[in-house]
From Swiss-Prot:
This is NAD(P)H-quinone oxidoreductase subunit 2 A, chloroplastic. The chain crosses the membrane at residues 24-44, 57-77, 99-119, 124-144, 149-169, 183-203, 227-247, 295-315, 323-343, 354-374, 395-415, 418-438, 484-504. It is an enzyme of class 7 (translocase). One of its GO terms (molecular function) is NADH dehydrogenase (ubiquinone) activity.
Length: 510
């Protein structure tokens, strides 16, 4: 009799759990429809990989690209809808989160065609590569919409695990193995530091995990100005700093950039920064609302160190990928200016605008590096000497992307930096803006040094790599060239397109 009653209670409890899960999927699942499309794409890839004897490579790329494009379409159809919180407060959808999700999807969509020829030439496993790219994209999208501490911790771990696997994808390469080990160890340490900061925030707020409820909890417990909040702020800043890779949390960046496959570096260089920026703005702006002066000071120090160290050390680099690694450290210093400015003076809008341009500039540069590496087998800067004499189109494309990264007018990078620095100046961040302007001049110097190498025609400076350079047939490498052309066009957009882009960015503010 007792067993019968216990069995009935177990069935009732199981039914309640099932109905609750069904209710969440039915009513809240529509709010993560773009992510569900990518999950469905993952399942299709696994099914094709497990059922097909011979890998149908075009279909694998088609499914991956189509799922990303469909996810972007679903995201655009949801634009301007009312903000909603779903999954018991764990996930929030609003224009601010969705613009960052769009940027992550855009990065992934451009990175897949950029990787096609590289994967085929290096004989890397295709299915697993695409699975990791899509899974990392899903993790980044969930991080952008995360509304509680647990989701904010789990989502980047999903992204990070895929990043570790992608960075060590060429297992026979000693540099790749070394980079992966450093990346994994430092990533694990940063995650521990981040969750320790979350524990201080959780305890100080009286056991709350949702971002807005943490603010209410801090008010109720009168702990919003306590030393515990300062400790939480320091630990969380260090943890997020690893994802953004500003100085001094940048030690992993040059090694991972140099040792990882170039398409992987292109993917990580933009998606990790977009996702981490979205998370950082929400964490600093909501739970640490009462500590704005403290986190402003911390971020100002990080921005100054990043802009100075990143651009100065980039001058001394001989590897193209290491140079771009230090350049990205400097670039994130500019982005931090927008985070500090915040809502008050269009800081977030300027940050979003600049990140959109940064995606095109950076991916365009990496597309050129992938093409040059496949045709010559080298990544050293000096081996680019005289490339214009052999492949003017590739040399001009690389030059335009580098000049845009430097911020020379009338390229997109100039208008992005101008808007970002203007917002910083209006907010009173005079020191940061002046340092940003000076370090931008420094970056133009080392970019122009590379462009001078590209355009040189003196035989004594041309290395054997370029002297024996052979352009591939027109039909070959067309996917990489397609990504490169799209990114180059986006990097050279004149100022006439700035007004609609800024208007869209301003519309995302929460």
């Amino acid at each position: 009799m007792i067993w019968h009653v216990q069995n009935e209670n177990f069935i009732l409890d199981s039914t309640r759990i099932f109905m609750k899960a069904f209710h969440l999927l039915l009513f809240d699942g529509s709010l993560i429809f773009p992510e569900c499309i990518l999950i469905f794409g993952l399942i299709l890839l696994l099914m094709i990989d497990s059922t097909s004897d011979q890998k149908d490579i075009p279909w694998l790329y088609f499914i991956s690209s189509t799922s990303l494009v469909m996810s972007i379409t679903a995201l655009l159809f949801r634009w301007r809808e009312e903000p909603m919180i779903s999954f018991s407060g764990n996930f929030q959808t609003n224009n601010f989160n969705e613009i960052f999700q769009f940027l992550i999807l855009l990065c992934s969509t451009l990175c897949i065609p950029l990787s096609v020829e590289y994967i085929e030439c290096t004989e890397m496993a295709i299915t697993e590569f695409l699975l990791f790219i899509l899974t990392a994209t899903i993790g980044g999208m969930f991080l952008c919409g995360a509304n509680d501490l647990i989701t904010i911790f789990v989502a980047p771990e999903c992204f990070s695990l895929c990043s570790y696997l992608l960075s060590g994808y060429t297992k026979k390469d000693v540099r790749s193995n070394e980079a992966t080990m450093k990346y994994l160890l430092m990533g694990g340490a940063s995650s521990s530091i981040l969750v320790h900061g979350f524990s201080w925030l959780y305890g100080s707020s009286g056991g709350e995990i949702e971002l807005q409820e943490i603010v209410n909890g801090l008010i109720n417990t009168q702990m919003y100005n306590s030393p515990g909040i300062s400790i939480a702020l320091i630990f969380i800043t260090v943890g997020i700093g690893f994802k953004l890779s500003p100085a001094p949390s940048h030690q992993w960046t040059p090694d991972v950039y140099e040792g990882s496959p170039t398409p992987v570096v292109a993917f990580l260089s933009v998606t990790s920064k977009v996702a981490a920026s979205a998370s950082a703005t929400r964490i600093f702006d909501i739970p640490f609302y009462f500590s704005s002066n403290e986190w402003h000071l911390l971020l100002e120090i990080l921005a100054i160190l990043s802009m100075i160290l990143g651009n100065l050390i980039a001058i001394t680099q001989t590897s193209m990928k290491r140079m771009l690694a230090y350049s990205s450290i400097g670039q994130i210093g500019y982005v931090i200016i927008g985070i500090i400015v915040g809502d008050s003076n269009d800081g977030y809008a300027s940050m979003i605008t600049y990140m959109l341009f940064y995606i095109s500039m950076n991916l365009g540069t990496f597309a050129c590096i992938v093409l040059f590496g496949l045709r010559t087998g080298t990544e050293n800067i000096r081996d680019y000497a005289g490339l214009y004499t052999k492949d003017p189109f590739l040399a001009l494309s690389l030059a335009l992307c580098l000049l845009s990264l430097g911020g020379l007018p009338p390229l997109a990078g100039f208008f992005g930096k101008l808007y970002l620095f203007w917002c910083g100046w209006q907010a009173g961040l005079y020191l940061l803006v002046l340092i940003g302007l000076l370090t931008s001049v420094v970056s133009i110097y080392y970019y122009l040094k590379i462009i001078k190498l590209l355009m040189t025609g003196r035989n004594q400076e041309i290395t054997p790599h370029v002297r024996n350079y052979r352009r591939s047939p027109l039909r070959s490498n067309n996917s990489i060239e397609l990504s490169m052309i799209v990114c180059v066009i986006a990097s050279t957009i004149p100022g006439i397109s700035m007004n609609p882009i800024i208007a869209i960015a301003q519309d995302t503010l929460f």
